[in-house]
Amino acid sequence: MKLNELRDNEGAARKKKRVARGPGSGKGKTAGRGIKGQKSRSGVALNGYEGGQMPLYRRLPKRGFTKPNRKEYAVVNLGLIQKFVDAGKLDASQPIDENAIVAAGVTSHKRDGIRVLAKGEITAKLALTVSGASKSAVEAIEKAGGSITLTAPAAAAASAE
């Protein structure tokens, strides 16, 4: 047997039936979809319907909830702040607040406030005023000789992680 002699077993591959090709084809007019209704239209799939089997979303238990007044903080890392200070876009000699951070382009929007995280190195002596910060970020800023003031309640800022 050679590669060019390979064939599917008899009946293993079924030819595709071309539908909506006239009345003589046996699948003309409605193309096997029946008459009218949602399922006869194009682009329709009944989401979550599994052919009568109990769908996955009903087999699994309900769990959790979404807090309606949840605070969403924009995250800024120390390394990024240092990069902007080095580039001259942030002035380390002046106090830096959330509006200055957004104006410099460190983050595009502040959402419910800005939360500073400790990723990266900080060498500049900064006076930061932000909504929240991680403990390691506060330690890194104070180690560099700077200070940080948190405007949001500590519990709210800590839960934003």
UniProtKB/Swiss-Prot annotation:
In its UniProt record, which GO terms are filed under biological process?
translation
Keyword Ribonucleoprotein among UniProt keywords: yes
Q: Ranges of Basic and acidic residues compositional bias? A: 1-13
Task: List the keywords (alphabetical).
Answer: Ribonucleoprotein, Ribosomal protein, RNA-binding, rRNA-binding
For molecular function, the Gene Ontology terms on record are: rRNA binding; structural constituent of ribosome
Which stretches does the entry tag as region Disordered?
1-51
Q: Which SUPFAM superfamilies match?
A: Ribosomal proteins L15p and L18e
Q: InterPro entries annotated for this entry? A: Ribosomal_uL15, Ribosomal_uL15/eL18, Ribosomal_uL15/eL18_sf, Ribosomal_uL15_bac-type, Ribosomal_uL15_CS
- GO CC annotation terms, alphabetical: large ribosomal subunit
Which spans does this entry mark as compositional bias, Gly residues?
23-35
Q: Which PANTHER family match?
A: 50S RIBOSOMAL PROTEIN L15, LARGE RIBOSOMAL SUBUNIT PROTEIN UL15M
Functionally, this protein is described as follows: Binds to the 23S rRNA.
Give the family from UniProt: Belongs to the universal ribosomal protein uL15 family.
- NCBIfam families assigned: rplO_bact
> Assembly state and interactors?
Part of the 50S ribosomal subunit.
Q: What is this protein called?
A: Large ribosomal subunit protein uL15
Q: Which organism is it from?
A: Cereibacter sphaeroides (strain ATCC 17023 / DSM 158 / JCM 6121 / CCUG 31486 / LMG 2827 / NBRC 12203 / NCIMB 8253 / ATH 2.4.1.)
Which lineage do the record's taxonomy fields give for this organism? Bacteria, Pseudomonadati, Pseudomonadota, Alphaproteobacteria, Rhodobacterales
